[in-house]
Amino acid sequence: HMGLGQPDFKTPKHVVEAAKKALDDGHHGYVMSNGIPECRQAVTRWIKKRYDVEVDFERILIMPGGKPTMSYAIQCFGEPGAEIIHPTPAFPIYESMINYTGSTSVPYDLTEDKDLKFNADKILSLITDKTRLLILINPNNPTGSFVEKPEIDKLAEGLKKHPHVTILSDEIYSRQI
């Protein structure tokens, strides 16, 4: 199945109840543009628990979903003359936003003979002086494939030679491995 990641389960009851309570408590107006402080603080606690990294909640930005997040990030780095490396097949917003910015789309193919996984050497070979952004997604959407740590480490080591490249790591399904 190579479709979009449409949830096939109900929203958890505690999430539904929290949304109802927020509405009942009168929270139906605009919030701070970077997100509700308590929510941002909760994200810092989650990051600490998951990655053992301290992050100031002032550096956290709450977004209304994956699509606008990807769109804004690609717009930040994309411009005519820039190259953006991205997987294919992948979430359609990547290539459409790259084209919107006037950047050059540089796909790295995820093929069945490689179990739909990226190859670090192939990605590194695509980097030029014009590369501004490298989009990674693991596990991949829509293939469901995921890349093992040794290959990720190999890519990370190779990227040290390219400090001009920013990594956009789409981790929407990372907790499902």
Where are these regions (language model features)?
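N-terminal small-domain helix-loop-helix segment of the aminotransferase-like
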Residues: 1-65, 72
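A short helix-loop-beta submotif of the ANL/AMP-binding
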Residues: 100-105
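Active-site phosphate-binding strand-loop segment of PLP-dependent enzymes
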Residues: 106, 112-177
